[in-house]
């Protein structure tokens, strides 16, 4: 009975290790797939400062690579928004037409449509968490007013509002990716963000998305070559580096779960070893009797294996 209980304990511990790690790997893959919706395979940002002008032969070289699916410019900033009298903060991300055509975010639209232009009217898609907080509805006619302090004008005590830049966009749709993204992100045309931030052709980053056939080796090759061509003035980050703290936390959690379950299995193994040791000590006189009758060590082992349950 002791041996059976010990064996069952070992089986349960091993099964728990396999099941829990499998479930965790599933969640890990799900989170990575969701994050890939809003994060590119590679992101080019300046080493110093917030914006740059994406020009030069390097960008032509990137565009010509067969493993590159799309390359788009983005301009991102924390802004103040107002919608029907409700105020709040948001992360406004201006994107170009390539993002509008190629982004997989349209698969996560929960209301309305993924559209950034309707004729000359600028539109925006908003995270469901932010939309819930601000009561934003793509079916309403109200626009979203976006404000940001002017970079070029000084604050006037007589008229402080003159130092605030403002634009207006209309909500076209709501998306839901994950809680952290949904509660703060809104996407709008990059030309409206450049107007708000008083930039001409400057962007905060260039997002590069690879084809489905591109593997990790190809991604690392591109990252290394782009970094070499652009030099120290720019950083080229993969998805892990873009969310280093999140992925490190997931890796540490997985390692911690693995170590805890391995520790449990080791304890169960010692329990089995102790149980068998006690069983042999208890049966040592029976073993001597069997040996006196001519039983070999092999036969005695078989007796313990067959009758030890």
Regions found by a protein language model. Give the residues of each.
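Short, strongly hydrophobic transmembrane alpha-helices
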Residues: 2-26
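Short, solvent-exposed hinge/capping segments at secondary-structure junctions
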Residues: 104, 126-141
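Juxtamembrane alpha-helical signal-transduction segment immediately C-terminal to a transmembrane helix
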Residues: 20-23, 27, 31, 249, ...
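Peri-transmembrane interface segments
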Residues: 1-4, 212-270, 279-281
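Hydrophobic, regular-secondary-structure patches
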Residues: 22-91, 97-120
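Basic-flanked hydrophobic alpha-helices used for secretion and membrane insertion
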Residues: 139-233
